């Protein structure tokens, strides 16, 4: 079994990789984590690598370029910057840095050679993307890390292990030279205690099943699982002792009516029938969520729960909701 909350040992991690099945709110949770980690005059970088511009939409800013820009102020004077990493731009930066091909690289891009290279070479795109994340995570200025933490809004669970572990294969393919050293550096970071991979899920069968599969794959790939972030948790409206009977359809309408009458409410029979049906439906959901939560707990990973919010926006949450989720994360120990 596991314990709830953010483990103290994760305070060492400098790179937080956030993945999850599509539709679980992965981008929103990654943004909230970046805000939580920036609280108290700290600086974090929120990175996306899939070209969706989800961060820009969530923070209501123009599309992010291939440069780090401040997008939010965290409580206590902290700062969140964001970066949309593009494989073609990363390759141009790589060519300019290691081969002094700045102008020539731009010419190659106009000719379509850069897109061709990142499409043709298996794994090269992911090496470039993770290489840029590694550079930002390890970068220093005046003897201090530029960022206290980097949060990566990673590909979904079905692709994340391949995305994170492709650098190991590339390191074997390139035995010498800059690409070899870059791959080795990325491998060291991603397979160290400085990196934690968090999985966002919902208390539903399919997301939970995919979460458990991903945790097992991370272990096999020697990638460090962090926490399971259970998103959109709804509070139960029934006493725990009443859930099993109600979920089984055993709700005494006469008793409900008597209780309502005692409270001064005389409902139409049709309305009462609807109320009883909603009670049964709610109890069925609560019981199903209890079972999926038990499956997650038995996997042994720490669990962090985030409430369902009603604000509308990306993933069903607006910017105010992101700040609220960041506050909840801080309350559960995120530092």
Predicted regions and their residues:
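Pre-Walker A (Motif I) flank of P-loop NTPase domains
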Residues: 11-16
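Walker A/P-loop NTP-binding active-site region of P-loop NTPases
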Residues: 19-85, 164-167
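Conserved beta-strand segments of the P-loop GTPase G domain that flank and frequently precede/overlap
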Residues: 19, 47-48, 153, 198-202, ...
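C-terminal lobe/tail of nucleotide-utilizing enzymes
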Residues: 1-10, 191, 195, 205-335
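Phosphate/Mg2+-binding loops and adjacent switch elements
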Residues: 102-213
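Conserved catalytic network of the ASCE P-loop NTPase/AAA+ motor domain
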Residues: 10, 36-40, 74-76, 139-145, ...
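Short secondary-structure boundary/capping segments
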Residues: 60-64, 99, 166-170, 215, ...
């Amino acid at each position: 079994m596991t314990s709830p909350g953010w483990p103290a040992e994760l305070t060492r991690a400098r790179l937080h990789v956030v993945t999850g099945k599509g539709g679980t709110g992965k981008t929103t949770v990654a943004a909230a984590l970046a805000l939580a980690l920036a609280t108290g005059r700290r600086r974090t970088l929120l990175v996306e690598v899939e070209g969706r511009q989800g961060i820009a939409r969530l923070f209501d800013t123009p599309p992010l370029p291939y440069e780090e820009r401040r997008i939010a102020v965290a409580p206590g004077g902290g700062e969140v910057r964001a970066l949309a990493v593009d494989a073609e731009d990363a390759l141009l930066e790589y060519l300019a840095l290691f081969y002094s091909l700045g102008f020539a690289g731009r010419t190659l891009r106009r000719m379509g050679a850069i897109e061709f290279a990142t499409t043709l070479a298996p794994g090269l795109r992911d090496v470039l993307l993770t290489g840029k994340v590694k550079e930002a995570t390890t970068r220093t200025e005046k003897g201090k890390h530029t960022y206290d933490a980097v949060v990566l809004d990673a590909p979904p669970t079905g692709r994340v292990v391949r995305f994170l572990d492709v650098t190991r294969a590339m390191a074997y393919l390139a035995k010498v030279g800059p690409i070899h050293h870059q791959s080795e550096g990325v491998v060291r970071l991603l397979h160290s205690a400085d990196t934690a991979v968090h999985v966002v899920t919902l208390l539903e069968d399919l997301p939970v099943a995919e979460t458990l599969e991903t945790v097992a794959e991370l272990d096999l790939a020697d990638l460090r699982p962090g926490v399971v972030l259970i998103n959109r948790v709804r509070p139960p409206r029934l006493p725990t002792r009443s859930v099993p009977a109600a979920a089984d359809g055993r709700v005494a309408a006469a008793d409900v009516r008597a209780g309502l009458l005692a409270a001064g409410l005389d409902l139409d029979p049709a309305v009462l029938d609807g109320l009883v049906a909603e009670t049964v439906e709610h109890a069925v959901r609560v019981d199903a969520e209890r079972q999926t939560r038990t499956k997650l707990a038995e996997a042994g990973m720490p669990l962090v729960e985030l409430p369902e919010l009603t604000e509308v926006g990306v993933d069903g949450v607006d910017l105010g909701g992101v700040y609220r989720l960041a506050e909840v994360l801080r309350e559960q120990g995120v530092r």
